[in-house]
Design a protein with these regions (language model features):
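Extracellular beta-rich repeat passengers
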Residues: 1-168
Length: 168
């Protein structure tokens, strides 16, 4: 399938307190034959973009003013041709990137190039947590290959919660 030139506004919400949530864009096990290009998630109530497994890649994406993470993935997502991601966080927001793998068995090293993560002055976190002021969180076995990253306005660049230290 193909998803090109789509803008989703004011979407997403937490639907239960057990981290069941709806994002601006949610991709569940989407394959590499799918085209995801020129997408905008604007001022949603959860993540701008989230991948749950799959092999799809995302090109030319903007996450603007979403109230949780700008970009988030887990459950073995392994997109290999991701480029030109831009995040602007304001008001209430958490990480620019949340990178998670629940175990070593589903940590597949996605690749992302040309990332800009910008946080506006005075942006608060959902849980008022100091750690959520970081640009990138590597959670559990989260990993990947990232290049050409611009980070501005965050307290720290990464949260090293992965076993390997989570460094970029």
């Amino acid at each position: 399938g193909t998803l090109k030139y789509v803008r989703v506004e004011y979407a997403g919400q937490v639907i239960t307190q057990n981290n069941k949530e709806q994002n601006g864009f949610s991709f569940y096990s989407v394959g590499s034959g799918t085209t995801l290009e020129n997408l905008v998630s604007y001022k949603g109530n959860d993540d701008g973009f989230e991948f749950y497994g799959g092999t799809a890649s995302l090109k030319n994406a903007i996450s603007y003013g979403n109230s949780d993470d700008a970009f988030d993935w887990q459950d073995g997502w392994r997109g290999q041709d991701n480029t030109n991601w831009y995040a602007y966080q304001e008001g209430v927001a958490n990480y620019g990137l949340e990178v998670e793998a629940k175990s070593v068995n589903n940590a597949f090293w996605p690749k992302v190039t040309n990332i800009t993560l910008k946080r506006a002055a005075g942006t608060a976190t959902e849980a008022q947590s100091e750690i959520q002021l970081d640009a990138i969180q590597f959670k559990k076995e989260g990993n990947g290959e990232y290049s050409n990253i611009i980070i501005d306005g965050y307290k720290n660049q990464t949260t090293p919660t992965a076993k390997n230290g989570g460094a970029i």
